[in-house]
From Swiss-Prot:
Homodimer. Part of the ribosomal stalk of the 50S ribosomal subunit. Forms a multimeric L10(L12)X complex, where L10 forms an elongated spine to which 2 to 4 L12 dimers bind in a sequential fashion. Binds GTP-bound translation factors. SUPFAM superfamilies: ClpS-like, Ribosomal protein L7/12, oligomerisation (N-terminal) domain. Signal peptide: none annotated. One of its GO terms (molecular function) is structural constituent of ribosome. It comes from Tolumonas auensis (strain DSM 9187 / NBRC 110442 / TA 4). The gene is rplL. This is Large ribosomal subunit protein bL12. Keywords: Ribonucleoprotein, Ribosomal protein. One of its GO terms (cellular component) is cytosolic large ribosomal subunit.
């Protein structure tokens, strides 16, 4: 007859702390392993290098062709003519916020083609 996992858990739960320590030591010796926790140093470094997933497209300067920039902003944002004009004239300002990297790069190319200066943050 074999012992089930539940029976093992119940047996360990009924042991004192000293008995559990002795059990762990015996298991380490029997199986040639260590119950020590693995250091989490490299994982913390990986979190610090977390890649940004949302970007803001900032219009920093209008450039010489204001009308083309307004048209590009209207096409990208679905704003009306007055709202797009106000947005462009308020530069430096955010054209779109929390967009993907691909969308931000595409919008930057469109606005720069229209003559605007653009940053992605």
């Amino acid at each position: 007859m074999s012992i089930t996992k539940d029976q093992i858990i119940e047996a360990v739960a009924s042991m004192s702390v000293m008995e559990v320590v002795e059990l762990i030591t015996a298991m380490e010796e029997k199986f040639g392993v260590s119950a020590a926790a693995v250091a989490a140093g490299p994982a913390a470094a990986a979190e610090a290098v977390e890649e940004q997933t949302e970007f803001n497209v900032m219009l920093t300067a209008i450039g010489a062709n204001k009308v083309a920039v307004i048209k590009a902003v209207r096409a990208a944002t679905s704003l009306g003519l007055k709202e797009a004009k106000d947005l462009v004239e308020a530069a430096p300002t955010a054209v779109k916020e929390a967009v993907s990297k691909d969308e931000a790069e595409a919008l930057k190319k469109e606005l720069e083609a229209a003559g605007a200066s653009v940053e992605i943050k």
